[in-house]
Amino acid sequence: MSAQKIYLASLLLFICLVFPQSTAIVCNFEGHCVTSDDCINVCKSGEDPFLCVRSGPHKGMCCCLKTNGSVLE
């Protein structure tokens, strides 16, 4: 039983190291939108429009992709 626990802990550690959270989508929330097409002209400073958020605290705002910012959940 002890060997199984060590194996499981090692497997979980490996997964955490191989798949870090840094691969999550990162957004800068800008403007107001109803559809994702509305975000094309909203995103500034070379950011790519990603989607119009339709729920949660950022409802009705455009998610503009960037390198540092809020993680989209």
Swiss-Prot record:
Repressor found in the keyword field: no
Disulfide bonds: C27-C64, C33-C52, C39-C62, C43-C63
Residues annotated as signal peptide: 1-24
One Pfam family matching this protein: AtDEF-like
Location of this chain's protein in the cell: Secreted
GO biological process: defense response to fungus; killing of cells of another organism
Predominant place of localization: secreted
Keyword Disulfide bond set for record: yes
Cellular compartments per GO CC: extracellular region
UniProt keyword annotations, A-Z: Antimicrobial, Disulfide bond, Fungicide, Plant defense, Secreted, Signal
Protein family per UniProt: Belongs to the DEFL family.
Annotated protein name in UniProt: Putative defensin-like protein 277
Source organism per UniProt: Arabidopsis thaliana (Mouse-ear cress)
